[in-house]
């Protein structure tokens, strides 16, 4: 959806002005492009940097930057779970915020070293350049809050793609109390259960905006 939104933003109709290939499984997109399918491809890091290093492609634009700030990655839970496991949810959100702060205050080299065990098949230099690109693009959220403007932008993207029939207010699906508590306590171990403002079966989104390259 964000790709289509970006194309429309630049006056390109994704269904008339080009052939948009959408029948390839996500896990096989990179290999399909590497085998000659398509002229452009939307990839996440570190795959984009791997292709550049191998001379199989070059990053020409960031869809994350072009589409604007979005709550691209979130954590969700049913209200029923939050009602009975608020302490666990708070500790989890605290950890997310502390990780976000750590990323914001450390270099791409330091971050790459820390996450290397999760990318055992990726060269450290490639991993570092991937993180550097994301940091330069402000891809990483600085806190777990989802702001109104980011929520509206997400709905604009979904509406443009025909996936959203009518707007949804932020507080209908997002419970910000856990993120607010994490920020206010600076994640120092305060796990006081946040006050619930709703008993409806809604979801809690725990990570704020982050684009993609």
Annotated model-derived regions:
Residues 155-213:
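Conserved C-terminal helix/tail region of periplasmic/extracytoplasmic solute-binding proteins
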Residues 9-10, 54, 118, 161:
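Alpha-helical structural context
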Residues 26-119:
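Pocket-lining segment of extracytoplasmic ligand-binding domains
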Residues 17, 61-62, 126, 145, ...:
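Residue-level detector of family-conserved "landmark" positions at structurally sensitive sites
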Residues 14, 58, 165-166:
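Residue-level detector of short coil/turn "hinge" positions at structural boundaries
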Residues 1-53, 148-153:
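Bilobed "Venus flytrap"/periplasmic-binding protein-like clamshell domains
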Residues 83-165:
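Secondary-structure end/capping motifs
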């Amino acid at each position: 959806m964000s790709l289509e939104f970006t194309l429309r933003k630049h006056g390109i109709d994704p269904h008339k002005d080009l052939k948009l290939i959408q029948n390839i499984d996500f896990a096989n997109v990179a290999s399909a492009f590497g085998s000659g399918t398509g002229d452009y491809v939307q990839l996440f890091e570190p795959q984009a940097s791997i292709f550049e290093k191998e001379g199989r492609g070059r990053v020409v634009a960031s869809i994350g930057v072009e589409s604007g700030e979005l709550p691209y990655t979130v954590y969700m839970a049913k209200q029923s779970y939050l009602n009975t496991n608020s302490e666990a949810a708070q500790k989890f959100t605290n950890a997310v915020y502390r990780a976000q702060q750590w990323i914001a205050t450390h270099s791409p080299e330091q971050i790459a070293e820390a996450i290397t065990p999760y990318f055992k098949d990726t060269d450290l230099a490639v991993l570092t350049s991937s993180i550097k690109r994301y940091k330069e693009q402000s891809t990483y959220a600085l806190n777990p809050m989802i702001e109104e403007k980011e929520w509206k932008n997400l709905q604009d993207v979904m509406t443009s793609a025909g996936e959203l029939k009518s707007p949804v207010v932020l507080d209908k699906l997002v419970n910000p109390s856990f993120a607010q508590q994490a920020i206010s306590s600076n994640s120092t171990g305060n796990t006081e259960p946040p006050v619930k403002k709703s008993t409806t079966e809604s979801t809690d989104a725990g990570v704020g905006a982050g684009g993609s390259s």
